[in-house]
């Protein structure tokens, strides 16, 4: 994990890089790493997306968007948070098929 500033953390899991845009989420990095290992997220992108979203829903994290992009280093998942309730922003979640 590299810290760019007090409100940014990132975790690289194989080809996947997960960026946490809220400093209160940084303590989840280790747990996400364990979850990724147990679910084999490096194998199937659609499964990766589903497992990630299920974990976010389970924790009732306030998410404004999940943005998934490919780059030359692999898959980049950016998770954006805001202070509204999850059910108010669930329609803005962006995933891939």
Segments predicted by a language model, with ranges:
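Extended, charge-rich alpha-helical interface modules
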Residues: 2-97
């Amino acid at each position: 994990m590299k810290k760019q500033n007090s409100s940014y953390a990132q975790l690289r899991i194989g080809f996947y890089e997960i960026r946490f845009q809220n400093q209160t989420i940084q303590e989840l990095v280790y747990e996400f790493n364990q979850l990724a290992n147990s679910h084999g997220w490096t194998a199937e992108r659609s499964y990766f997306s589903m497992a990630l979203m299920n974990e976010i829903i389970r924790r009732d994290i306030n998410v404004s968007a999940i943005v998934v992009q490919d780059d030359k280093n692999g898959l980049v998942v950016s998770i954006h948070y805001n202070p509204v309730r999850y059910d108010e922003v669930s329609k803005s979640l962006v995933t891939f098929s």
